[in-house]
Regions:
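Rossmann-fold NAD(P)-dependent oxidoreductase module
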Residues: 15-19, 99, 135
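Conserved cofactor-binding/catalytic machinery of classical short-chain dehydrogenase/reductase
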Residues: 54, 92-95, 107, 131-132, ...
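NAD(P)H-binding glycine-rich loop region in Rossmannoid oxidoreductase-like domains
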Residues: 35-41, 45-102, 114-121
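Conserved glycine-rich Rossmann-like NAD(P)H-binding loop of the short-chain dehydrogenase/reductase
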Residues: 25-32
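Oxidoreductase cofactor-interface core, primarily capturing Rossmann-like NAD(P)-dependent enzymes
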Residues: 23, 118-210
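Residues forming the Rossmann-fold NAD(P)(H) cofactor-binding site
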Residues: 13-15, 90, 130
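N-terminal Rossmann NAD(P)H-binding glycine-rich loop of SDR-like oxidoreductase domains
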Residues: 3-23
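SDR active-site strand-loop-helix element
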Residues: 6, 30, 71-72, 108-114, ...
Length: 210
């Protein structure tokens, strides 16, 4: 059995690829030119070089596959470089789903996010996730959408973003706070409350459990 994985070199994708291999399923990965080194078990995978906006590469990736898993999303956008979640998360998943439907692929799995919503004043990341969900639901595919919360676990190199590391880089280093104290972050909109540090819950999931 073969399963196409779009976004298989990313953080969650690397773990999902490992799980497919462990279950004797051959992953066929769509890999951007120059990113082949991010494939952790290349001898156990079939690799197609190309981008998600290249229909021919997408078709080659899904050819003779029983299912496709779409994982692409950008933690940080660079609009000036054309790197946006509208393009890669929403439009990309929409394109892949439409091609999958034409090719007769049986199953489509989309990794969305717990906070996916259409709020125009909210996160563009979550907006794109919501639009992706709607695009998949509007097809005739046998689809499954999963909505994990924040993922954590070993990023295993490759420049893969991981929640705890990003929290340290993007937040802890931005405020003058003693490193030996717990970081109080109950609400980033109402300020910091040192008295309540450590008393707030986060709903997180290890990448291996996705």
């Amino acid at each position: 059995m073969k399963v196409a994985v779009i976004g298989g070199t990313g953080y969650a994708g690397s773990y999902i690829t490992d799980e497919l291999i462990a279950n004797n399923i051959t992953p066929r990965l769509l890999v951007r030119d120059g990113s082949g080194s991010k494939v952790l078990q290349p001898d156990q995978c079939e690799i197609v070089i190309g981008d998600v906006d290249n229909d021919e590469a997408v078709q080659d990736t899904m050819d003779d596959c029983e299912a496709v898993i779409y994982l692409i999303a950008l933690v940080r956008e660079f609009p000036s470089k054309g790197l946006t979640n509208e393009k890669f998360q929403f439009r990309g998943s929409e394109r892949v789903a439409n091609i999958a439907q034409k090719m007769g692929v049986k199953r489509f799995l989309l990794m969305s996010a717990l906070g996916a919503n259409p709020d125009p004043d909210g996160s563009k990341y979550m907006q794109a996730k919501h639009l992706s969900e709607q695009a998949i639901k509007n097809t005739d595919l046998d689809w499954t959408i999963i909505r994990p919360s924040s993922l954590f676990g070993d990023p295993r190199g490759g420049g893969r973003p991981e929640f705890c590391m990003m929290l340290d880089q993007l937040m802890l280093n931005l405020v003058p706070f003693p490193s030996f104290l717990p970081f109080p972050a109950p609400s980033f909109f109402t300020g910091l409350n040192p008295l309540d540090a450590g008393n707030y819950s986060l709903s997180m999931i290890h990448a291996k459990d996705v």
